[in-house]
Structures are given as structure tokens and as C-alpha cells.
Amino acid sequence: MSAVFDPSQYDAQLAAKAARLRELLAPFGAPEPSVFDSPREHYRLRAEFRLWREGGQRHYAMFAPGEKHKAILIDDFPIASQRINELMPRLKAAWQGNEDLNNRLFQVEFLTTLAGDAMVTLCYHRPLDEAWEAAAQQLASELNVSVIGRSKGKRVVIGRDYAVENLDIAGRTFSYRQPEGAFTQPNGAVNQKMLGWAFEAMGERDDDLLELYCGNGNFTLPLATRARQVLATEISKTSVNAALHNLDENGVDNVRLVRLSAEELTQALNEVRPFRRLEGIDLKSYDFGTVFVDPPRAGMDPDTCELTRRFERILYISCNPETLAQNIAQLQDTHRIERCALFDQFPYTHHMESGVLLVRR
């Protein structure tokens, strides 16, 4: 599938992705997938650009795979949010007009939200001094953004080191803090649809939810309103801190969050070894009816996959349908697919986000 931005080809490309997902899930008797499309442009809420010197000036640049010495200079980026496209020329004019901002600048990162927040990270091959900080303060004020300066071993924050997102799920607005440098869903509109699908698939439950790989609480917040109690795990300290803030900010008080990997939690549930991070949490007090997983591209490792088998319901969000199919193959003797969906997080690429609800046979 072409990675070229061409809205006229969008519908055909989405149909091809849906056909591929049907093909991968057909051996498991999957129902027809729900298909959630993306805006055709301005859908990507974050972007990262290297800078390239040409004509005595630094320009935004991207590179084709395997061609890191052949820059493609760009002035706008139609797949990025309108806020990013509005900021790009203003930021470029600012560094071109101020040597304190321009000197040894090599990379720019944007993070925006559907709520209108924006953060810009400027990366340098030099130490950041007071003159840079003064220029960055003025820049932040003029552009109405937070500015993060990064150089080797140092980070300078002008404003906040996070952006704020608001997402509407089933009639309720959830507020999320998205830290600089941490993972966030890039396509906000599709993320909102994906959360709505997961919320509906979860259903109203009177038992408990186990969530693996919870990140900043993207799914945790809405799903917690559908369960009695939630035990959520995440390994990234930055994401854990953001998730704890987001739970408190949204008044969600039925979630315990622990910094464990999925593999470590498997050991804890199987009573292989105790974990200090689980002190005060009685795993046997939970009545888990559903496990929610959103693993990395490699999918669930075999032990985690076996762990999920003990649950009546498995709600699985996947960024790689190939490994999703491999995991389902491991589970198909005990679970069947009740519903499935395609979420077009990454238009004009071959990448697919999908979801399945597996229930015990």
C-alpha cells in the first residue's frame, strides 16, 4: 500500500485494510468487523521533523526509508493537525529571526490535542543558556504553546511539560495529561472512536477488570466506569505518573495501578514470587471477569497469552493484526471472537489498529 498522501485513494485503501483483517480473522469464525474511518487530512496530533540546512537556513525535513542523506524539505504537513500546520511557519520564522533559537537546532517535535493544547520540543547539539531561555519564553508567549528545550543531559521547560486532551466517551468528557516524550495515540479522532467501541464492548459489569499495558490511562478511565474494580499495570514510570494524575483529575477511584510488566504480573497471579510493588494489594480479593490488553507490536508473549486464557472475556486492542491472529490461534480452543473492529489510526500506510472481544466457549 502506498504511503503517499492522496485523499482520493483513501476509501480504496481502507477497504483493502478491512479485507486483510477479514482474511486474518476468518479462520477463527470472526463476525463482520466494524470499520472506523479517519479524517482524510489533519488527523495526526503529533509530528517530529529533523532540520536540514540549505541556502543558509534550516528547514523542516523528512527522509525516505534508507535515504538519511537525501532530505525532503517541507513547508506544511497535511496529515498533521491544523494547529501543527499553523505553528510550523511561525516557529520557522522565529528561529530564522533569532540566533539563540537557531544555533545548533537539529530537531523539532510537535504535540497537539483535540482540546486545542500544543507543546513544541526543540532539540539542540549545544548546551542551553539563559539567552536561549529568554528567547524561548518569548516564543512560548507569542505562539501560545509550552516549549521544551532539550540538549545532551538537560531539559528546560517553558510552561508545562505535558499537553491536555479532552475526549468525549458515551456522553462523558475525560481529561488526559499527555507528558512530553511519552506515548500518546497519534490520531485523536480515531482514538475517540476506539475508546467508544471498547466502552461498548466492555458492557456494564458487576465484576472486576484487569488491564495490562495501561499507559497514561487512555482506556482505563472510560472502562473503569463499566467495572466494579480495576487493577491496571504499566512499566513506564512516566506513564504511571500520568495515569495516576488522570485518575485523580477525573474522579475515578476504583482503580489500583501498579508498576509491573505483564510478565511480572503473570508471576504474581501464579504465586511464583512476591513483589514489593504489590504490598497492600490482595490479588485474591479481585473477581476478574475481563482482561483488557493493548500490547506492543510483538503481541502478547506466550506466558501472558496463557494468563489471559483464565478470564471469561478478553478485550484486545492490537496495533499489529498479524500478531493478533497468532495470539488468537493460541486461544481459539477456549475462546471465540464475539466482535471485532478496524480502527484506521494510520491512513495512507499499511499499518492497522484493530480490536477483538473474545469470550469463553
Curated annotation (Swiss-Prot):
Its EC number is 2.1.1.-, 2.1.1.35. CDD domains: AdoMet_MTases. Dual-specificity methyltransferase that catalyzes the formation of 5-methyluridine at position 54 (m5U54) in all tRNAs, and that of position 341 (m5U341) in tmRNA (transfer-mRNA). Gene3D superfamilies: 2.40.50.1070, Vaccinia Virus protein VP39. The keyword tRNA processing applies. SUPFAM superfamilies: S-adenosyl-L-methionine-dependent methyltransferases. Belongs to the class I-like SAM-binding methyltransferase superfamily. RNA M5U methyltransferase family. TrmA subfamily. GO terms for biological process: tRNA methylation. One of its GO terms (cellular component) is cytosol. It catalyses: uridine(54) in tRNA + S-adenosyl-L-methionine = 5-methyluridine(54) in tRNA + S-adenosyl-L-homocysteine + H(+); uridine(341) in tmRNA + S-adenosyl-L-methionine = 5-methyluridine(341) in tmRNA + S-adenosyl-L-homocysteine + H(+). It comes from Pseudomonas entomophila (strain L48). The lineage of its organism: Bacteria, Pseudomonadati, Pseudomonadota, Gammaproteobacteria, Pseudomonadales. This is tRNA/tmRNA (uracil-C(5))-methyltransferase. The active site is at C319 (nucleophile), E353 (proton acceptor).
